[in-house]
Regions:
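Conserved N-terminal beta1-alpha1 strand-loop-helix module at the mouth
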Residues: 1-62, 71, 80-84
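Conserved anion-binding
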Residues: 59, 67, 71-123
C-alpha cells in the first residue's frame, strides 16, 4: 500500500486550462509529481494531445478533467480523453454509458460526486 500522499498537478485556473500549460509543464517535468492534467477547455485539441504525449514521454500519469452535465457532453469528454491517450477521465456526472466507454478504452473513470453546478464547478 502506498503510504505517501499523491497529488494531481492541474494546469488550470477557474476550470479552464491555462494558456501557458505546456511552458509550465516544461519547467516542472523533472519533478517527482506523477499525476498531471488539465481541463477539456482552454487549449485547441492538437495542443492538448501534444501536451499529454509530452507528459507521458516523461513518465507521468495523465488526467483530463471534463466539466459536463449531460450524458452526451460527458461522452464527448471521454472520447477526447481516449483520443489524447489519457490515463484518467476526471469529472463529469456519473453515467453508465461513460463508465462503459472508459472501460472499453482503458480509461480510469473518476466522476464528480454529489450535486455539481456551474463553471467553475461548485461541488
Amino acid at each position: 500500500m502506498n503510504t505517501h500522499p499523491e497529488l494531481i498537478v492541474m494546469l488550470t485556473y477557474n476550470d479552464v486550462t491555462v494558456p501557458q500549460a505546456a511552458e509550465v509543464f516544461a519547467k516542472c517535468e523533472h519533478t517527482r509529481a506523477r499525476y498531471w492534467g488539465f481541463k477539456e477547455a482552454g487549449l485547441p485539441f492538437a495542443e492538448m494531445r501534444d501536451l499529454f504525449a509530452r507528459m507521458k514521454a516523461c513518465g507521468k500519469q495523465t488526467c483530463l478533467e471534463v466539466v459536463a452535465y449531460t450524458e452526451a457532453e460527458c461522452l464527448r469528454g471521454a472520447e477526447m480523453a481516449a483520443a489524447c491517450g489519457c490515463d484518467f477521465l476526471l469529472g463529469t456526472v456519473f453515467s453508465e454509458a461513460v463508465n462503459a466507454y472508459c472501460r472499453a478504452h482503458g480509461l480510469l473513470y473518476m466522476p464528480f460526486v454529489g450535486q455539481v453546478t456551474g463553471r467553475p464547478s461548485v461541488l
